[in-house]
Curated annotation (Swiss-Prot):
The gene is FAE1. Residues 69-368 form the FAE domain. It comes from the Eukaryota. Disulfide bonds: none annotated. Belongs to the thiolase-like superfamily. Chalcone/stilbene synthases family. The active site is at C223, H302, H387, H391, H420, N424. Induction: Repressed by herbicides such as flufenacet and benfuresate. Pathway: Lipid metabolism; fatty acid biosynthesis. This is 3-ketoacyl-CoA synthase 18. It catalyses: a very-long-chain acyl-CoA + malonyl-CoA + H(+) = a very-long-chain 3-oxoacyl-CoA + CO2 + CoA. Contributes to fatty acids elongation and stockage in developing seeds. Active on both saturated and mono-unsaturated acyl-CoAs of 16 and 18 carbons. Required for the elongation of C18 to C20 and of C20 to C22 fatty acids. Also mediates the synthesis of VLCFAs from 20 to 26 carbons in length (e.g. C20:1, C20, C22:1, C22, C24:1, C24, C26). Has no activity with polyunsaturated C18:2 and C18:3 or with acyl-CoAs having 22 carbons or longer chain length. GO terms for molecular function: fatty acid elongase activity. Keywords: Acyltransferase, Endoplasmic reticulum, Membrane, Microsome, NAD, NADP, Transferase, Transmembrane, Transmembrane helix.
Amino acid sequence: MTSVNVKLLYRYVLTNFFNLCLFPLTAFLAGKASRLTINDLHNFLSYLQHNLITVTLLFAFTVFGLVLYIVTRPNPVYLVDYSCYLPPPHLKVSVSKVMDIFYQIRKADTSSRNVACDDPSSLDFLRKIQERSGLGDETYSPEGLIHVPPRKTFAASREETEKVIIGALENLFENTKVNPREIGILVVNSSMFNPTPSLSAMVVNTFKLRSNIKSFNLGGMGCSAGVIAIDLAKDLLHVHKNTYALVVSTENITQGIYAGENRSMMVSNCLFRVGGAAILLSNKSGDRRRSKYKLVHTVRTHTGADDKSFRCVQQEDDESGKIGVCLSKDITNVAGTTLTKNIATLGPLILPLSEKFLFFATFVAKKLLKDKIKHYYVPDFKLAVDHFCIHAGGRAVIDELEKNLGLSPIDVEASRSTLHRFGNTSSSSIWYELAYIEAKGRMKKGNKAWQIALGSGFKCNSAVWVALRNVKASANSPWQHCIDRYPVKIDSDLSKSKTHVQNGRS
């Protein structure tokens, strides 16, 4: 108990060091001021009169500096609102339904009809991965894959993506009452499906956006592309004043489904599900009052210069010529290394002085003592961040980040619940997690939320937001009909998940 109190005292002293120093300084100046006489004031005024040019120049430079700072500083970027797509109920799939879809896909593939469908080991492998994935029985599959026989056509892929994007945007425009023609910047990201005309062009056409819109379409950038899109929109909002930026993050499941027998490529079939999010950003000062959040920091880390990082998630042909996404056995180590580099950049921006000092001290000690100190000090990010939105890439990803960042079960609750309810929706998963926190009523004014996105390349990207008010869930939130059933409890044997309401956590 004593060590805990000492640590708390240490953190308080360092975090409030400048404030603590300010009190004696203020007292000293107040004491000096109380001893001033009328004669001292006359002498001071006389000094100003004899040095009028110097005083005037100093005042002019001060005013010029303040004006220059106000004019050149970037405008704040506000998150007015966002919308996560909720697919229709008939697209819900249980674990057993997903297994049936896998079987139908393999059966429909003429090159594997006599082998893969009759291979119990392949389907048994898929079943084990599916049951241990952390996904529940109410995730969503695209229309084309539910159809018997499955439709893996280009038209089915386009239909899936258009329904997700249009559905999310219609709800966003309805909630914000923003006219689509007011949008000045558009960024759409979809890794696997990039038709011509582009998805951003489809949005322009569907919602009749204006002809001078700054439009961007990001492809092939993986599950971390959502934060990349936010970062790009932020930079554009710093240049183009008084406008709105629209960010759309989604992924296509129909296009990315794998029908072969390579087990490294089968895993993604078990994790990815339908989902997408639309986010409205603004740099208009008048939008602060109605916005939910202000963007504080974005940090992007790319370790693609290393071959192991570059190849750990890769779309390629298998031995029989079928295209799939191969997940390397090195992915966990690569993700950990990339995350470490990302938080090494983000930490100094958000951590209190006490944590910065401890990290710096252990860094110097490790350099001097080398082998005597095995690990660097892991900062307590819970002192700087109130809510964590970790990409719901899978149970292993969430477990690893929970351990590496020293988080508690409630810190990763939003991620686990999103994975269970919606599966891995790729770049949009961090928005379903933020919506979960809002639906639980936990987002209070001044709270900071940290979105952590991991993706192929290999990339780790972070976005930190601060709540401008007590944030409630928006209309038509994806959690509005099921939030009372969460969080979920996953059995320790990883084989089955059961949903129940924990006392005091609903």
